[in-house]
Amino acid sequence: MDVDRLQEALKDFEKRGKKDVSPELDQFLCHVAKTGETVVQWPQFKEYFLFKLEKVMDDFRTSAPEQRGPPNPNVEYIPFDEMKQRILKIVASFNGTPFTIQRLCELLTDPRRNYTGTDKFLRGVEKNIMVVSCVYPSSEKNTSPSLNRMNGVMFPSNSQSYTDRSNVNGPGTPRPTNRPKFTLSSPMNTNGLPDSMENKESDLQQKEKSLSDSAVFDDGSQATTPKNKHSAEDSVEAEEHEVKRLKFDTEEDEEAACANPDASSEVSTEMAEEAECASTSADKGKESCQTAQTADEESLMTASESTEVECNERDSETVSVSEESSEESHQMEESEQSESACSLNSEEPNSAAAAASTAGTDSSEGNIGIKSTEILSLSPMENSEEATNAPEEPMEQD
């Protein structure tokens, strides 16, 4: 559409008194009806639009008289002249191009396309002019930086230049905000659906099962080492308990022998037997310690070292006890010899008892290993003092 020719046609229309139809301006209205683009501003073609609208309404009434019969009770009846003046007044109040300009131009160029009655045609026109939004011509987008609108009316001002926006809801419609795209955090299957909860539960069960198996294996490996330790400690404690019991028994027997010197021979034999049993048990204890040591060398070094130390201490105790018992037996032998000498001078039965006691002491000398206490070491010393004091009495009798 040539803008220069259009402006010349508008000037000619004004010169002719705004009463004649211009083919060029009718062609302009057809162009707007097809494309919706207004090449010129609204004030320039507003007068011709009003002239064309009034002419079409008059022609429509002459060609199609008003409807006969009673009017529609659901619609307010308005006379033609009143409706015509109302429509022309609303259009004349526009200071900007209404955004329904394309539909209005269609009604002006081809009024009988959709309507046959005058009343319906007027209501269709009224519906399209009851708007407030405006549109801008294509030329105004680039050449008119000082336009403003308020309630569908354009006012010249120092506003910013027009920016391209959609005319569906009219100019000035706020633009939609750009919403961020959210991605699914859950994994997707091949068909595009997220994984089901059953798969997640099965994975969790497998993980828990593997963790429990590893924990049981660790507990079993840790439980084997304390078992070996406890078994070795139990054997050592049993041996120590047995040795203490034998030691306590020997102490009681020796005390009884001191009280009854006639039964010393029997006690000495019993002590010898118990000493042999103790020695055999000690040997067995050593062997068990050695076997436990060889079995637990790799896994339990601490347990084997403790058993070795205890065995060495036990050996040293047995050696010290044997030395003490040898000294005590030597002292007892001397005291018994002195007693035998005194008894020979006094009475023969006493010499026989002394000989029996010396025989018992000789047998006790061969069996070393009896454990004694400090009480036994004190009793022979008292006997020796009595023996030294006994020979003095026969000398006085002589």
From Swiss-Prot:
Disulfide cross-links: none
Biased composition (Low complexity): 338-366
Ranges for region Disordered: 138-398
Signal sequence coordinates: none
Pfam families (UniProt xref): PPP4R2
GO cellular component: cytoplasm; nucleus; protein phosphatase 4 complex
Listed Polar residues bias regions: 139-149, 156-170, 183-193, 278-294
GO molecular function, one term: protein phosphatase regulator activity
Bias (Basic and acidic residues): 197-211
Stated role: Regulatory subunit of serine/threonine-protein phosphatase 4 (PP4).
Subunit organization: Serine/threonine-protein phosphatase 4 (PP4) occurs in different assemblies of the catalytic and one or more regulatory subunits.
Family recorded in the similarity comment: Belongs to the PPP4R2 family.
PANTHER family found in the cross-reference section: PPP4R2-RELATED PROTEIN (PTHR16487), PROTEIN PHOSPHATASE 4 REGULATORY SUBUNIT 2-RELATED (PTHR16487:SF0)
Name listed for the protein in its UniProt record: Serine/threonine-protein phosphatase 4 regulatory subunit 2-B
Gene: ppp4r2-b
